[in-house]
Amino acid sequence: LLSGMVNECNLDPIPTSVNKKSDLCVSPKMIDTKKLKVAVSYDLGFAPMSKLCKDTFDKKLNKINNFFHSVKFAHPEMINADKTFYLLRGIGFVNDFSEINNNNPGSLGSVIVDELKRASSISIKDIGWAMSEHTKIYRNAEHFFEEYDLLITPAASVPPFKHEEEYPKEIDGIEMENYLKWEAISYGVTLFGGPAIVIPCGNIDGKMPFGIQLISRKNSDINLLDVAYSLEQKFKGNSDLELI
C-alpha cells in the first residue's frame, strides 16, 4: 500500500505515479463486490502450502464465492519467483549491510551475516537474469489484472505457531530450504509491484485466526482498501468468516 502514502519526488531516479493525497482523507467505503472478477490460488504455482491451510481456504471460498461476479482458480505465471526474489533481495542486503559488517564485525545478527555470505556469490550475469525475470513476472501480473480485478490467496502457508519457534522448518513433512521459504505466498506478490492486504477470515481448525491475502494491480491501493473494508463488513455476523 506504499503508493497510497507517498508523494512524487524529483529525487527519485525511477519515478512512478502515486495516488492523490485527497483520496487518503476519505474513509474506506462499501463497494459492490458483485462486480468483481476474482482469481484465487492456493500457492501462486510455486509457494509451499500446508494441506490444512488449503482445506481451510476451500471452506472459506465456499462461503464467499457468491460475494463476487465470478471466481476462478488462476494466477500470473511466476515459476521463477523464488530465484528472482532471492537474487534481488541479496543485492539489497549487500547495499544495506555490507559496510556495517565490514566496519563493525559481529554487530549484525547471524541471519543477516549468512545472507551477506550468500549474496557475495551473486554475479553480474545473475543480476541481469534477475532483473529480466522480474520484468517478465511484473508484466505477467499486469496482463493478468486486465482480466481479473482481484487475486485471493491464503495469507500464510501454515497455521499460527508458537513464538518460541523461529520459523517452520518443514511443512507437511517437506523440509524448508531456508528461513524465508514458508513466507513465499507473501514475498512472491511483491514482484508484482502492486498492493496486497491481509484480512481475517474466521478461524483455522476451529482454534487460531485464519487470514486471506487480497492482491490487485499496481496503483490500485485505495480501491483495494475499499475491497478489504467491504469484505470485512460482509463477514460480520457469519461465524465461519468473522474472527472469533
Regions found by a protein language model. Name each.
Residues 142-143, 176-199:
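Small-aliphatic-rich amphipathic alpha-helix that forms the alpha element of a beta-alpha
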Residues 51-75, 97-103, 127, 131-148:
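Acyltransferase
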Residues 47, 159-160:
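Short glycine-rich, flexible loops that bind phosphorylated cofactors or substrates
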Residues 129, 161-182:
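Short, surface-exposed loop/helix-turn segments at secondary-structure junctions
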Residues 227-231:
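Short amphipathic alpha-helices in soluble, non-transmembrane regions
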Residues 27-41, 88-142, 154, 158, ...:
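Short helix-loop capping/hinge segments that flank enzyme active sites or metal/cofactor-binding pockets
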Residues 1-55, 234-244:
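A short helix-breaking turn/cap at a secondary-structure junction
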Residues 208-217, 224-225:
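Short, well-ordered beta-strand elements
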